[in-house]
């Protein structure tokens, strides 16, 4: 293969020097021919198949401004095989399928172009980090992507992909001391090399105030930016604290007050820190007057924001606010340490920014040491300095589409490679299944239809409490707006409690709450210090019973109306939302949630505070689930909840989870939604499913894994890996949350508009005549077994997993039954499922994109 590989490298050198379009196309076609020859020496999907074969899931990678990361989860008993596979992957890699992957990057680039937010972000960061690599979008400039050099990629790999510039981060249920020798045995063979000196960039000048304007956004937006600090700087944590004085998750910051006072639609502060440099950002969206359907000016928005920023610069900082923010830091750190994935992120940051792990673990101690003088000094030093202001107006950005050459698919060899046999010969540990033990959940009932579940928290003293009412927007369409009002309202009374005061009172107790709604449920989520559970619950209950939706000049409800009006207008220009609405129309017809929701002019803009308060009170007449996770004894918790919550003794039974009526698919049908502005077309495939039966759960899983299971599934393999037609492609059957509810097959391909016909041909060939690879079943059994065994909730979600299982009729962890069924799986199960539920079934196809291509 080596001569072919060297030829591919040389051809890319030629392509980079060729400017004539016809000549370039000829070179690309020649690259494709040689790449197809080289593809015979190794399967492009072998790595993903090997990961699947050891039970690995979530195979992916990402590139940020400062680091590239490769990751997946896997069972610890396969540790040696996983270490061997990854270490071998990094030893003399051959980039034979470079052209195919580059095509996928083109698709990714074009996909981002259809989102105005991409253009806004690129414009702002291009100015904020001018002169630095941070000014460039991560995916790169179009010219770089059009003229890639494989030789430069290989040089980059040889320079930076060395063990002295690399971290291996493992978090999970394994023995550290027995794993260390395995790491030495596998990764120890990688050769260190001296690293070149990193490019030193000058700091972007912030010598005077500067102002920029651009018509790129979905709505007007103000961005104010100051020069900040790099990660690890002595002022980094204090600047983070200053940002939280402006906005935070408790909604008690100075900018939060502006939104709660209905002066702004949205405002947030953030400390953007990176390896070399950083910026301090304030983002605000103007208030929209629902009566005139106009935003307040960006000038007025800037005046409001800068008045609050100036308070910090002048040292006008409320000591009480400082202590509330400090307590919130403590809570958020403790919550972070609850989850393995967050520990991965912590270690990832420690490596990327060369920070001692011990220092990161001392965050609470370091936050405790921040003084008022520190805050005043840092606020004045950074926020009192020159700034860059960005006025983003509504507009349509120019899109520089990347053209793709017409290339033929790569056909890789099938069957087991020698490497696969080698990996299989490495001894694996023994799988010891563990299942979810629900016995520690205290289950009780206050009244018929009012259930309470208490789960112990042994990690910290932060409780979480969810009130889940059995009604949502499907039955009460205005409930969406009542929930929005609850998140911005205070409490009735004489004199009553204003919205900001209500949030501050909760924060003093270490508490916070939020309200949300779905098709079928209304949620009240409460969190806080365990010692103040009773007071926090009492305060939230008071808010639930006596919310104050009235305001001077109806500013509060007009704010909500303005948000809805603005959101509806954004929907018309956001291709992702338009596609979602089109999909729902194809699926549900006149029952689409976009059609059934309250009409903007006739209903939303006519809403009254009393009307929405009435809707909110209807919620409390429905079936209720109470989910508590905390450290207090269940008996004490139930006593607090029973006495402090206003519970209805006679509730209406829930009809949720909602099953929205669908449009039956009785014949093949294609829907077109033309949009000439789109760089990438969206293609959906829909097939009606059968009523869900949990006895078929494993068959659904097996088909989904075989047909659409990540990089190893047929869809990604045929459409992305072989043909480079799409960055995103999938296909799966969704399982219903309740026995007997309908399932459905949903497929998707995002591709250039001129590739739509080809992509549909390939996808339809998979649906009409599914390729059969029985040899993949061992991998599928392995990954499904690992998937069901590792699909465990956090302690905070444990009781909700229990009730979800109960809806499906399970009395134990479903994995206990599914592991047995997985062991019996054969390819006949997959084939039978396909023939009964897919083959020959009528299909609806939805195409959204530029019709001219």
Predicted regions and their residues:
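M16 family metallopeptidases and their MPP-like homologs
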Residues: 1-88, 119-143, 165-171, 220-230, ...
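Proteins synthesized as precursors that undergo proteolytic processing into mature forms
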Residues: 240, 480-484, 701
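Peptidyl-prolyl cis-trans isomerase
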Residues: 37-46, 52-53, 95-97, 148-150, ...
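Proteolytic maturation boundary segments
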Residues: 175-214, 221, 251, 256, ...
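Carboxylate/His-rich catalytic cores and anion/metal-binding grooves
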Residues: 106-113
């Amino acid at each position: 293969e080596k001569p072919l590989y060297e030829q591919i490298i040389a051809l890319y050198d030629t392509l980079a020097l060729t400017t004539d379009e016809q000549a370039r196309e000829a070179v690309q076609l020649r690259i494709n021919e040689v790449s197809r020859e080289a593809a015979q020496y190794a399967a492009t999907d072998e790595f993903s198949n090997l990961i699947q074969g050891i039970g690995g899931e979530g195979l992916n990678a990402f590139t940020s401004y400062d680091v590239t990361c490769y990751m997946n989860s896997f069972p610890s008993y396969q540790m040696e095989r996983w270490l061997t596979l990854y270490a071998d992957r990094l030893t003399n890699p051959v980039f034979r399928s470079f052209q195919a992957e580059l095509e996928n990057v083109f698709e990714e680039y074009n996909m981002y172009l259809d989102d105005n937010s991409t253009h806004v972000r690129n414009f702002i960061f291009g100015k904020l980090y001018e002169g630095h690599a941070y000014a460039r979008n991560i995916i790169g400039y179009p010219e770089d992507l059009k003229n890639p050099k494989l030789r430069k990629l290989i040089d980059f790999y040889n320079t930076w992909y060395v063990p002295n510039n690399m971290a291996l981060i493992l978090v999970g249920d394994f023995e550290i001391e027995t794993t260390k020798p395995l790491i030495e045995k596998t990764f120890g063979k990688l050769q260190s090399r001296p690293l070149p000196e990193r490019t030193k960039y000058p700091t972007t000048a912030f010598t005077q105030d500067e102002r920029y304007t651009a018509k790129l956004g979905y709505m007007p937006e103000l961005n104010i930016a100051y020069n900040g600090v790099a990660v690890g700087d002595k002022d980094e944590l204090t600047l983070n604290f200053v940002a939280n004085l402006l906005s935070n998750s408790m909604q008690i910051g100075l900018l939060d007050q502006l939104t709660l006072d209905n002066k702004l639609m949205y405002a947030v502060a953030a400390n953007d820190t990176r390896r070399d440099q950083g910026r301090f950002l304030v983002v605000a969206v103007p208030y929209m007057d629902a009566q005139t359907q106009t935003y307040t000016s960006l000038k007025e928005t800037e005046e409001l924001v800068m008045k609050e920023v100036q308070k910090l610069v002048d040292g006008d900082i409320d000591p009480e606010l400082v202590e509330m923010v400090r307590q919130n830091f403590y809570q958020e750190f403790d919550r972070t340490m609850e989850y393995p994935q967050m520990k991965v992120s912590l270690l990832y940051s420690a490596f990327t920014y060369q920070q001692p792990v011990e220092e990161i673990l001392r965050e609470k101690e370091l936050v405790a040491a921040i003084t008022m003088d520190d805050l005043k000094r840092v606020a004045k030093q950074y926020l009192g300095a020159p700034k860059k202001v960005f006025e983003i107006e509504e507009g349509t950005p120019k899109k520089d589409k990347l053209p793709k050459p017409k290339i033929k698919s790569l056909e890789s060899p099938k069957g087991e490679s020698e490497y696969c046999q080698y990996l299989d010969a490495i001894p694996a540990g023994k799988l010891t299944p563990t299942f979810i033990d629900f016995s520690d959940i205290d289950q009780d009932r206050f009244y018929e239809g009012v259930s309470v579940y208490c789960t112990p928290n042994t990690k910290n003293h932060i409780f979480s409490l969810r009130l889940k009412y059995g009604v949502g927007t499907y039955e009460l369409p205005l409930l969406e707006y009542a929930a929005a009002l609850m998140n911005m309202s205070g409490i009735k009374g004489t004199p009553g409690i204003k919205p900001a005061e209500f949030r501050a009172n909760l924060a003093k107790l270490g508490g916070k709450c939020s309200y949300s709604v779905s098709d079928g449920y209304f949620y009240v989520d409460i969190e806080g210090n365990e010692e103040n559970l009773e007071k926090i619950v009492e305060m939230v209950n008071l808010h639930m019973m006596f919310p104050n939706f009235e305001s001077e000049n109806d500013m509060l409800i007009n704010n909500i109306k303005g948000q809805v009006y603005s959101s509806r207008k954004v929907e018309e220009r956001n291709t992702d939302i338009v596609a979602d609405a089109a999909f729902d129309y194809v699926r549900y017809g006149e029952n689409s949630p976009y059609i059934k929701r309250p009409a903007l002019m006739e209903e939303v803009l006519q809403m009254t505070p009393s009307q929405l308060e009435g809707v909110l009170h209807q919620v409390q007449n429905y079936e209720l689930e109470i989910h508590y996770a905390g450290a207090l004894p269940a008996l004490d918790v139930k006593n607090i909840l029973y006495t402090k919550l206003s519970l209805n003794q006679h509730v209406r039974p829930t009809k949720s989870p909602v099953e929205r009526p669908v449009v039956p698919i009785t014949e093949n049908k294609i829907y077109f939604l033309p949009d000439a502005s789109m760089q990438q077309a969206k293609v959906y495939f829909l097939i009606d499913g059968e009523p869900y039966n949990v006895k078929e759960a494993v068959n659904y899983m097996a088909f989904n894994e075989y047909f659409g299971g990540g990089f190893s599934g047929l869809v990604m393999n045929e459409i992305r890996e072989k043909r480079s037609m799409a960055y995103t492609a999938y296909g799966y059957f969704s399982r219903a949350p309740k026995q007997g509810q309908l399932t459905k097959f949903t497929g998707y391909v995002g591709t250039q508009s001129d590739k739509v016909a080809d992509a549909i041909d390939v996808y339809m060939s998979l649906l009409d005549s599914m390729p059969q690879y029985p040899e993949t079943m061992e991998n599928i059994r392995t990954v499904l077994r690992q998937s069901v065994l590792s699909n465990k909730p956090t302690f905070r979600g444990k009781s909700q997993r229990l009730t979800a299982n109960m809806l499906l009729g399970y009395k134990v962890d479903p994995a206990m039954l599914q592991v047995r069924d997985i062991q019996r799986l054969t390819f006949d199960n997959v084939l039978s499922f396909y023939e009964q539920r897919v083959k020959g079934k009528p299909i609806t196809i939805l195409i959204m994109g530029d019709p001219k291509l």
